Amino acid sequence: MKKLLTGLSAFLLFSPLHVFAADGALSDTALGTTLPLWSCIPFAGMLLSIAIFPLIKEEWWEKHKPWVVAFWSLLFLIPFAVIFGGHIALEHLIEVTLGDYLTFIVLLFGLFCVAGNISLQGDLTGNPKVNVVLLLIGTLLSSWIGTTGASMLMIRPIIRANKWRQRKVQIMVFFIFLISNIGGCLTPVGDPPLLMGFMNGVGFFWSLNLLPVMLLNVLILLTLFFLIDTKAYKKDIADGFKPEIRPESERVKLHLDGAHNIAFMLIIVAAVILSGVLPTTFPVFSEGLTIMGVTLSYASIIEIIMILASAYLSFKTTKKEIRDSNHFTWDAIEEVAILFIGIFITMIPALLILKARGADLGLTQPWQFFWITGALSSFLDNTPTYLVFFTTAASLGFSSGVQTLTSFIPKVVLMAISCGAVFMGANTYIGNAPNFMVRSIAEENGIKMPSFFGYMFWSLSCCLLYTSPSPR
């Protein structure tokens, strides 16, 4: 693998790219129109590697994961550079790493660090009723501190409460459905696609229109979870597994250790909001550091500084014992950082094609927008996917509805796009960043999570239930 990567890198460095380069700079639309569908093969290879290698060669995968990511990334970048020119390839590489990946991974890192310094302690026994309450609390938090923030805050208390359980994979799966995805649909803070809508003129509290849809889906999923978890709970009891219940005099009341870190989490949430508000309120913040035509805005730089400062101060002001009680390690964030840089790079052609040809799909009905946005958000980054169909809907010439910066979008169409992007991120481990984080943390704590395809079996089985009441 290393020799192959060395050869690919040498070819990229010494090949006469300028001879093959396309004349002049191509716009994203021109690139998307020109790119063939087979240019998405490295992206498909990346997804299949994530799905298959952990099943057939787990130890090899853990050791060589970075090399696999580098292989698929170069397999896209080299032909792309040869055909369209090294300058264009480098520009898109910088755009996806500096413009998208950097803020993405910094946000995850910050929330991961701060949440790891908060520990819910006390006697809390995991059973179906308690688990439903914990999932509901996390779901309601998701829209106000983000799906990633809520996931990182709630994952360890739920794992700790159910430590005695033997059958608990369903808890983690529904955790991803509810807290890591569906719960984030009520505000722009909840999930990045809605923040993108807010930046394009949709009112901050408009997403509250999704409350009835969210409540119905949450009710369906919590009912289904309660039935599944009750069955698993009874089997655990029948097999002789019981929670340790201490005498009344020895019980510890529920309390938060490291509670001051909630302030740092709120600072991170404020940083995300500011990154969306500042450029539209004060245009100077949309300017910034420019490299190869790609600008990292001052608003994004402020966001990054606030997040990293919060993470640093969180560690400096929190005792190590609290992290130890959470079994805190860096493995989960390291895995997400490695895999998602490959996903971001290899999905460049897929997003370019979607941006160029999305308007040609003939979408007019809300149900069409819901399903196409949702299906693509399951595998692509749901933020640009949302933006593509948001723009497509805005270009259809509607004369009434939700007013955006450029035009009107009917309320039910915007609801369909929003629900598709947010809800369907639950369909795969890569549909939304918290999904993979939850999976990694669960496995660190001894919970054997489903494989990539095994998880999809869970999600698609439930998909028929939680999408049936969505906008049409």
Please state what every model-predicted region is.
Residues 466-471:
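Conserved small/polar residues in nucleotide/adenosyl-binding loops
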Residues 79-96, 112-126, 144-152, 350-356:
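Transmembrane alpha-helix boundary signature
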Residues 79-81, 142, 152-167, 171-173, ...:
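Membrane-interfacial helix-loop connectors
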Residues 1-22:
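N-terminal secretory/membrane targeting signals
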Residues 27-38, 60-67, 91-102, 204-212, ...:
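Interfacial loop-to-helix junctions that mark the boundaries of transmembrane helices
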Residues 267-388, 392:
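Transmembrane helical segments that form the transport core of multi-pass membrane transport proteins
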Residues 39-50, 64-81, 101-110, 136, ...:
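Hydrophobic mid-bilayer segments of alpha-helices in multi-pass membrane transport proteins
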Residues 165-231, 237-262, 437-465:
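Membrane-core helix-loop-helix motifs of multi-pass transport proteins
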